[in-house]
Amino acid sequence: MRKIRKSIVTLYPFNLFKFTDMKKRIIQFLTTYFLFVLLFALQKPIFMVYYRELYINASLGDYFRVMWHGLPLDLSLAGYLTAIPGLLLIASAWTDSSVLRRIRQVYFGLIAFIMACIFIVDLGLYGFWGFRLDATPIFYFFSSPKDAMASVSFWFVLLGIVAMLIYAGILYCIFYYVLIREKNPMKIPYRRQNVSLALLLLTAALFIPIRGGFTVSTMNLSKVYFSSDQLMNHAAINPAFSFMYSATHQNNFEKQYRFMDPNTADKLFAKMVDKPATPADSIPQLLNTQRPNIVFIILESFSTHLMETFGGQPNVAVNMDKFAKEGILFSNFYANSFRTDRGLASIISGYPGQPSTSIMKYPEKTDKLPSIPRSLKNAGYNLEYYYGGDADFTNMRSYLVSSGIGKIICDKDFPLSERTGKWGAQDHVLFQRLLKDMKEEKQQEPFLKLVQTSSSHEPFEVPFHRLDDKVLNAFAYADSCVGDFIKQYQELPQWKNTVFVLVPDHQGAYPYPIENPLDGQTIPLILIGGAIKEPRVIDTYASQIDIAATLLSQLGLPHDEFTFSKDILNPSSPHFGYFTRPNYFGMVTPENQLVYNLDANTVQLDEGTEKGANLEKGKAFLQKLYDDLAKR
């Protein structure tokens, strides 16, 4: 009998628990994997406790449900992180060199640091952006580190760095005492081929959780969506996986958001583009001249919630409320995205914001975008851009120059004594400079001036103290700067031939949080000036991308190259508001207000008399946007 058992052991090399050195390595492998899973799982309740105001109604069971449903991403990322330790364990079966131990120490030290950075950055940014970490901050930081950090205070950054170091230290201590320190060092096994083969199979098996199983779909964020409450779904997301997934899906635009076959998308999209006016004179004229001077005032983070006109906060944007009555108000207007770089492209080029990237990242693509400035330059307009901050932030300068703007006034054009804001020159300084230039310089008319404000942005530190609420006070300050400028400009002879386009770059900061995603995109669009025929309210549904076609149509200029822009005043064109964020798109018409979650691939909100009417149209619109992005 002993001979038979000995023969079985000899013939069966995978009798794993017969060999101490093999057992040690397998236990080490499994410990490494499940330790990563445990650490990722514990991050979720920490996130929820940190944002306890958002999760105030969450029960203890909700915490466990979030951890349970978040496991697929945790298991997947743990698989990625265990692969290298698995290979090192295989190597340890062939050599006991101290080099392997040093590699393990460096590897786990690096992983501890990366995990800490991602978790703390995600923890800090979620309160500002409302979605888990993706690759977006990398673009903002490297385009202008100063501006990327301007939204937060020095102490916020310092505390974040300290938290990263402490968390990284805690993680490394855990890794050291559980994985790195060897009380009984593993020896080179007698049957090293068998040990290596067993560990190789285990390492290869990591492909299963990494991929998410054997089904057709691979691991993605939708795997952890389980609740109708988006806050619960957000808590279940592993921020490190979200960041990695976003970073590796930045450029393959032609493969992203494939909802339907190309022919179906083409047919649906053809019904959503601008149409020839029928009859030709059916478009009402808003201006009393065809070549007015045009001043765009792009308001940082403004929204309808700040205006009493829309039922928002009274006594905040008092000048905007005044202009809404004196000028032309578009009352059902939407921001196309959630950040300045996406908002600028929507306003200036009629190009919708993208959920997974920003076209501003790719100067070779923005070079090929149509733009209002270029169209007006060809019509004889003089172009200038004014901004109190860094014009290089998010590649804005390259975009503006490629749009035909020759004169760019930015932070470097103001003396240091006037750059007192976190973002550079405060708004009142910006408008004083603009007014001074307009008075002193011999203005070549007609002109287009793009003015971008910055003070109504985190950290909301402004030289103005009318309201107790810091955030509302910053918006009231920006509003007062616009009001004072327009009041003084009215005294200039250019007033009678000028139209001001007042539009936010996106909505943000107030109120917070916003539960309904539709409420997070509503912004005002107001036209005012001496070139306006008469005040009126236009209730057509539209968004920032429609400004280009509408304005150029009023000037009698072609706008065919603005593929996604529609004339808001054209009764023959389809009208809708469209917007995207990193995890959803929305399409809004009087009949249907729809939001589709791109992570979960499910309808998040569906209201109106014709529920679901905008679902396929919204998908086709996004698919065609990415087709266009891939070609540029």
Where on the chain are the PLM-derived regions?
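N-terminal, intrinsically disordered charge-dense segments
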Residues: R2-I4
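Transmembrane and membrane-interface helices of multi-pass
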Residues: F17-N252
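Alpha-helix initiation and N-capping motif
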Residues: L39, A135, P145, I237-F241, ...
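The feature marks either
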Residues: D229, A236-F241, Y245-I283, Q290, ...
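Solvent-exposed soluble domains appended to multi-pass membrane proteins
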Residues: A270-R632
